[in-house]
Regions:
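CBM-like, beta-strand-rich accessory domains located in the C-terminal region of large
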Residues: 8-16, 107-340
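Catalytic Cys-His active-site segments of thiol-dependent hydrolases/isopeptidases
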Residues: 101-106
Length: 340
C-alpha cells in the first residue's frame, strides 16, 4: 500500500499527490502576501479560448448573472483519462442565473458505479452517439481538438473535431469524421452544426440534458427545457428534410448509490432530501446512413418565449425566425460562416 502524503511528510512531494505541499505554500508563503485588487468581471473578455486544454468559454454579460448567457464548449487533447470525461465536442449552457443544458450525473465517490458508467460516459453529456455508442472513456488517446475559433461582427464561432474519441469505440476505420461547430449569434442564441461520416451506415443520436423539466414536440422538432424561471428552446433542422424521433427519460441507466440519493448521506451531498434523476433527451435519426448533417438552434429566454422559434433550411442556409421578432439567415460550412 502506498503511504499517504501525510505519512511521508516532505519526502518526494514532487512525485506524489501534493496536499502537503499545498498546505505549506498556502500557510507559510502565500498567506503573507496581499490579496489582489478586485476587478469587475466585466473588464475581462466575454469569450476566451484556452488552447492548451481545448476549452472555449463564451459569455454575453460576464459578471451579470441575471443577464448572462454562458456556453462552455470542449474538445480536448487530454482525452478521457483519469478525472476527464468522454465529452469531446460537448457543451453546457447556463443563462439568466440558471442551469439549462447541463452535464448530467453525479459523483457520489470516485469510481462509483454511477460515476463510472454514467457520469464519465458520453451519454451523460450534450453530445452525440453513433449507433448508441459514445466516445471511449478512460483513455488518453480519446482526444478532440479545437480547429476554429473566430470572432465576427455578429458571431463567435468555435469548431471541434472529436473523430479520434469516437473512432476508438468503433471498429477500426469505421469513423471517418465527427465534428461540431458552435456558433454564438449576437451573444443571444446558439447554432450547432454536427457532421458525421462513416465507412458503413449508422444511426445518430443527438443528446440534451436538463435538471428538471424537458419536453419534446415531434411536429415542430423542438425540445423545451424549463428551469425555475428561464427556458431553453432547441429546434433540430435536417437539410435533407428528415425528421428525428425524440424520447425523454427521467432515469439514469446506472442509478445513484441509494446511500447517497436516499440515505443518511443525502443531506450532506445534496440541497434536498433526494438527488434528482434529471431529464435526458435523445433525438434519433430514423435511418442509418454513411453521412449525417444536422443543425440545432438553441434559444435561451429569461421566461417562456412569447413567439415560437422557427428555423428551416433554404438554399444552403438556415432561415431563423427568432422569438424576438427578428429573422436571420445563417450560413455555416467548413469554409465559411455568415450571419445576415
Amino acid at each position: 500500500k502506498r503511504p499517504s502524503p501525510a505519512e511521508r511528510g516532505l519526502e518526494g512531494l514532487d512525485r506524489i499527490y501534493p496536499p502537503s505541499a499545498e498546505f505549506l505554500v498556502r500557510n507559510f508563503i502565500a498567506s503573507s502576501l496581499p490579496m489582489p485588487t478586485p476587478r469587475p468581471l466585466s473588464d475581462l473578455p466575454r469569450e476566451r479560448y484556452f488552447s492548451d486544454i481545448g476549452w472555449v468559454s463564451l459569455h454575453s454579460a460576464l459578471g451579470e448573472p441575471d443577464r448572462d448567457i454562458h456556453i462552455t464548449f470542449v474538445s480536448s487533447p487530454y482525452g478521457s483519462f483519469s478525472h476527464s470525461h468522454a465529452h469531446q465536442d460537448a457543451f453546457v449552457l447556463n443563462a439568466f442565473g440558471e442551469n439549462l443544458a447541463i452535464a448530467s450525473g453525479y459523483r457520489e465517490f470516485h469510481n462509483s458505479p454511477h460515476h463510472d458508467q454514467w457520469t464519465r460516459q458520453t451519454k451523460s453529456k450534450n453530445a452525440i452517439l453513433i449507433d448508441g455508442i459514445g466516445q471511449k472513456p478512460q483513455d488518453k488517446n480519446a482526444t478532440g481538438r479545437i480547429t476554429r475559433c473566430q470572432i465576427g461582427n455578429r458571431f463567435v464561432l468555435s469548431s471541434g473535431d472529436a473523430t479520434p474519441a469516437y473512432a476508438l469505440a468503433q471498429p477500426k476505420g469505421r469513423v471517418k469524421r465527427v465534428t461540431r461547430d458552435l456558433l454564438f449569434v449576437d451573444h443571444r442564441y446558439v447554432v450547432i452544426r454536427d457532421v458525421v461520416a462513416l465507412e458503413t451506415p449508422g444511426t445518430l443520436s443527438w443528446l440534451l440534458h436538463a435538471e428538471n423539466s424537458l419536453d419534446w414536440n415531434p411536429r415542430t422538432q423542438t425540445a423545451l427545457i424549463r428551469a425555475a424561471k428561464s427556458t431553453l428552446t432547441t429546434q433540430l433542422v435536417s437539410p435533407d428534410g428528415g425528421k428525428w424521433t425524440g424520447t425523454v427519460s427521467d432515469k439514469f441507466t446506472t442509478p445513484v448509490d441509494p446511500k447517497y440519493s436516499q440515505g443518511n448521506a443525502a443531506a450532506s451531498y445534496s440541497s434536498g432530501s433526494k438527488w434528482s434523476e434529471q431529464k435526458h433527451f435523445s433525438a434519433e435519426s430514423q435511418k442509418a446512413a454513411k453521412e449525417h448533417l444536422l443543425f440545432a438552434v438553441l434559444w435561451p429566454e429569461p421566461r417562456t418565449p412569447e413567439r415560437p422559434l422557427k428555423a428551416s433550411w433554404k438554399n444552403g442556409s438556415l432561415e431563423i425566425h427568432r422569438p424576438d421578432g427578428r429573422t436571420d439567415t445563417v450560413r455555416l460550412t467548413d469554409d465559411a460562416v455568415s450571419v445576415q
